[in-house]
């Protein structure tokens, strides 16, 4: 995962993350960063600010649900305010003819232009007269472009009735993730889990290398491939023999065809896990049980409720089976569908874990309302939300 500035830049008490999945990305960050997070703020939908104590940069490199990470180095009352502290820092990493950019999130066009002007003036006052300004489409330099254009990118967003700014210090290796989705023998479809989302879900499980993750609705194995890449032992189950074969081919491809005993994928029923596992408990379960049919138009609310109702029994029966098979300190991560209707309603499949001895996972100082919705999805009228359960102690 590329650090585009020295890791010491992140040795600060405030960092900002540009979110890939909205609140789900915040949940992932609170899980991965753990006790280093003392407070989290959501100044806008695209960016969250985390107050941290003694944050090892290696934790940042584990994140999948963030597009960028930047320390908060300047907070301005107005877009034309002095930003010497930021531009002085930038000048120490720039040479004349270096590329610079400003990525503005939920900032108006006039304020964005004023911020760009203030940034350039500050850099030039520091003695760099020939830096090149990249003007990104939509006022946001995408994370991959930060790397390909070798730009010193500044993240800016509304904060405390003013603006917060900081240099992008880290971006994820999005190209490698995308290749795992498109080059494997059985690529994921437009409506199935992306590798990035699958890795985010795996991170919510909070496992250490060598522990065991089970996906009881594994499909073509996207979650298992991402879990294996984190050195986890992988168990996969699917009721369709064709999908079991696809999952085996994909995970074998992901490790270069090497024969390995770190995974086991078999045909079976997710509602009978305890019998299948012969009473063995797994460290985590991460799964998307059923992908509803792709919709070509928003359904009526009554139709959406009927669709959810037909799937609810499978989900709840499977959750009961998962509860019997999870280790006492493990987690269960389940994706559920959210249907947007023509009347403007959202119909969500809800899960109840209390009677199964489960409670909702709440990391650190932030309280989450479940199911946690994904933002910025392109799946049109069927979207996703996520439950994370853990056994009651």
Question: Which role does the model predict for each range below?
Answer:
Residues 104-106, 123, 127, 169:
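Generic hydrophobic/packing signal
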Residues 96-99, 209-210:
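Phosphate-coordination loops involved in phosphoryl transfer and adenosine-cofactor binding
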């Amino acid at each position: 995962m590329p650090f585009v500035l020295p890791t010491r830049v992140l040795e600060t008490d405030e960092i900002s993350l540009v979110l890939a999945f909205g609140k789900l990305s915040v949940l992932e960050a609170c899980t991965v960063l753990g006790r280093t997070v003392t407070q989290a703020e959501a100044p806008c939908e695209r960016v969250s600010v985390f107050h941290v104590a003694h944050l090892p940069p290696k934790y940042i490199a584990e994140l999948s649900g963030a597009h960028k990470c930047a320390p908060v180095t300047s907070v301005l009352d107005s877009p034309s305010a002095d930003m010497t502290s930021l531009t002085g820092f930038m000048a120490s990493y720039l040479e004349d003819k270096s590329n610079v950019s400003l990525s503005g999130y939920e900032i108006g066009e006039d304020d964005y232009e004023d911020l760009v002007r203030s940034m350039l003036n500050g850099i030039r006052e520091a003695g760099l007269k020939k830096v090149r300004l990249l003007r990104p489409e939509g006022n946001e330099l995408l994370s991959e472009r930060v790397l390909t254009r070798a730009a010193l990118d500044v993240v800016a967003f509304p904060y405390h009735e003013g603006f917060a700014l900081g240099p992008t210090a880290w971006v994820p290796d999005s190209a490698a993730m995308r290749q795992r989705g498109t080059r494997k023998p059985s690529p994921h479809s437009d409506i199935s889990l992306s590798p990035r989302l699958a890795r985010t879900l795996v991170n919510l499980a909070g496992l250490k290398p060598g522990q065991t993750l089970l996906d009881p609705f594994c499909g073509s194995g996207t979650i298992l491939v991402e879990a294996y890449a984190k050195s986890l032992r992988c168990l996969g189950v699917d009721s369709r023999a064709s999908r079991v074969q696809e999952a085996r081919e994909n995970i074998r491809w992901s490790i270069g065809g090497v024969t390995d005993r770190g995974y086991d994928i078999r045909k079976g029923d997710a509602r009978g896990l305890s019998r299948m596992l012969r009473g063995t408990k797994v460290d985590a379960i991460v799964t998307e049980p059923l992908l509803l049919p792709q919709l070509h138009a928003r359904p009526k609310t009554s139709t959406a409720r009927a669709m959810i109702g037909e799937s609810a029994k499978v989900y709840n029966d499977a959750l009961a089976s998962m509860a019997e098979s999870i280790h006492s300190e493990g987690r269960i991560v389940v994706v559920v569908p959210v249907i947007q209707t023509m009347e403007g309603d959202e119909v969500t499949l809800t899960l109840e874990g209390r009677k199964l001895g489960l409670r909702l996972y709440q990391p650190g100082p932030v309280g989450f309302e479940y199911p946690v919705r994904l933002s910025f999805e392109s799946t049109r009228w069927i979207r996703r939300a996520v439950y994370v359960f853990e056994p009651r102690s």
